């Protein structure tokens, strides 16, 4: 089993978490577009740097050299998020960045060998999110119901809290990845292009989306025994997928201004949330038995609980945080 010790990451993640309450940075850099501040642009930037020491699996090769232990430093995430509140009802969101650049991998497509486009160099900058959103029913303190709708490349992909997690405030070192079951198959880095609706009714929060999955064309291995058939992603002209997440917030209410779910509030909120979500895509995988191709639907379900309870002196920002999730992947 590969064992990895991330020496500096935990410290860096802690710094990122605490920075959310910084009086200098706050929720990013805000530029008002009118004197009242109701029209504005906001920018949020974050970098996550990993220094690692890893005990490698037997037979591991790096650069044609067999190794048993490896130390390296890499760029886990470099991101820039910008959104423009054009009016109280209309917002434009753009999120760009890179992921996982090291000395040996993460470079742009076609990079390799040595030189200007050698191994790991010049990673491909791409859009993580790009959508427009309109508030049909504006959220107000005195009104229990709100509704916003939007379209574009988005992160409202349902399933679970961890499936829509922010990368700014994990309590753990990173996400376990299986919370994104289709990552880089029928989605673009856990996103799809589609239409979404989000909102609240008192303490109940809902998110729904209708999306066009990215095309996949993996070829299944043909077998003679149906029990041995293994489905692969192959949707060709993909049919529309549907996703949703529903959550009840028993204590403090969370913001749903953006889709990114917080990992820990470090004592600034008292949270106890119970949620459930789904993702379904018809005719999205195929198997081959005796030369006969059969299509299958993807049906995913999750139920989760999130607890984040302040403890001790509020000024020290301490909390007991817990998260548990059940996934059913078919």
Which residues does each PLM region occupy?
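Detector for outer-membrane/organellar transmembrane beta-barrel domains
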Residues: 27, 248-330
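Short, contiguous, pocket-lining structural segments
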Residues: 189, 209, 231-241, 268, ...
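Positively charged n-region of N-terminal signal peptides that target proteins for export
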Residues: 1-4
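Outer membrane beta-barrel
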Residues: 29-56, 67-216, 238-254
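Boundary at the C-terminal end of the N-terminal hydrophobic targeting segment
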Residues: 17-21
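Active-site-proximal beta-alpha loop/turn segments in soluble metabolic enzymes
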Residues: 215-233
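Short, glycine/acidic-enriched capping/hinge loops at junctions between secondary-structure elements
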Residues: 54-60, 286-289
């Amino acid at each position: 089993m590969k064992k990895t010790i991330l020496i500096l990451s935990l410290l860096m993640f802690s710094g990122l978490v605490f920075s959310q309450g910084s009086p200098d940075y706050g929720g990013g850099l805000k530029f008002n577009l009118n004197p009242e501040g109701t029209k504005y642009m906001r920018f949020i930037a974050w970098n996550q740097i990993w220094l690692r020491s890893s005990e490698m699996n037997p037979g591991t090769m790096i650069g044609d050299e067999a190794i048993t232990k490896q130390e390296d430093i890499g760029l886990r995430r470099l991101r820039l998020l910008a959104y423009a509140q054009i009016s109280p009802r209309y917002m434009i969101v753009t999120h760009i960045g890179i992921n996982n650049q090291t000395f040996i991998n993460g470079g742009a497509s076609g990079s390799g060998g040595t030189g200007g486009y050698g191994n790991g160099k010049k990673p491909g900058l791409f859009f993580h999110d790009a959508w427009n959103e309109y508030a049909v029913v504006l959220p107000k303190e005195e009104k229990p119901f709100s509704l916003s709708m939007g379209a574009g490349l988005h992160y409202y992909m349902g399933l679970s809290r961890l499936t829509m997690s922010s990368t700014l405030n994990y309590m753990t070192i990173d996400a376990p990845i299986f919370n994104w079951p289709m990552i880089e198959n029928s989605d673009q880095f856990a996103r799809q292009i589609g239409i979404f609706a989000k909102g609240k009714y008192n303490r109940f929060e809902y998110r729904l989306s209708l999306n066009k999955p990215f095309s996949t064309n993996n070829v299944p291995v043909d077998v003679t025994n149906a029990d041995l058939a293994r489905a692969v992603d192959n949707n060709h002209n993909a049919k529309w997928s549907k996703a949703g997440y529903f959550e009840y917030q028993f204590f403090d209410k969370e913001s749903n201004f953006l889709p990114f779910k917080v990992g820990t509030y470090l004592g600034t909120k008292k949270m106890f949330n119970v949620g459930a979500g789904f993702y379904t895509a018809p005719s999205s995988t195929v198997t081959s038995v005796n030369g006969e191709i059969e299509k299958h639907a993807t049906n995913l379900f999750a139920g989760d609980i999130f607890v984040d309870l302040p403890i001790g002196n509020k000024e020290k920002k301490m909390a007991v945080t817990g998260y548990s999730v059940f996934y059913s992947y078919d």
